[in-house]
Design a protein with these regions (language model features):
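Cyclophilin-like peptidyl-prolyl cis-trans isomerases
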Residues: 1-114
């Protein structure tokens, strides 16, 4: 069954002053995440919305590089699927960096988040 698609990003439904905790349950254990909307409000709102819609339910990590990274969130399993919309990058002024144990959103280039 194809993944659900939307025409535009969801309206803001989160409180940008709060941090959010997320648990991703896998067959290898549970991954606990903290999301920081004060640094990337659209990205956190997008993740919270799609998770609430069941968009990620049953989705596999389609790319695994041992001792480096895992990539998931694409219901097609190809690495190029998404919810049907895009939104702008939120990196300017963002103090968070790509370090060990950090979650980031992959995209297809500038302003192609979704």
């Amino acid at each position: 069954m194809p993944a659900q698609q939307w025409d535009s990003p969801p309206e803001m439904q989160i409180d940008e002053t709060k941090n959010y905790s997320v648990s991703i349950t896998t067959n290898r254990g549970t991954i606990e995440l903290e999301l920081y909307p004060q640094h990337a409000p659209q990205t956190v709102n997008n993740f919270v919305y799609l998770a609430g819609q069941g968009f990620y339910d049953g989705v596999l990590f389609h790319r695994v590089i041992p001792n480096f990274m895992i990539q998931g969130g694409d219901p097609t399993g190809s690495g190029s699927g998404g919810p049907g919309y895009r939104f702008a990058d939120e990196c300017d002024g963002n103090p968070l960096r790509h370090e060990r144990c950090v979650i980031s959103m992959a995209n297809a280039g500038p302003n192609t988040n979704g």
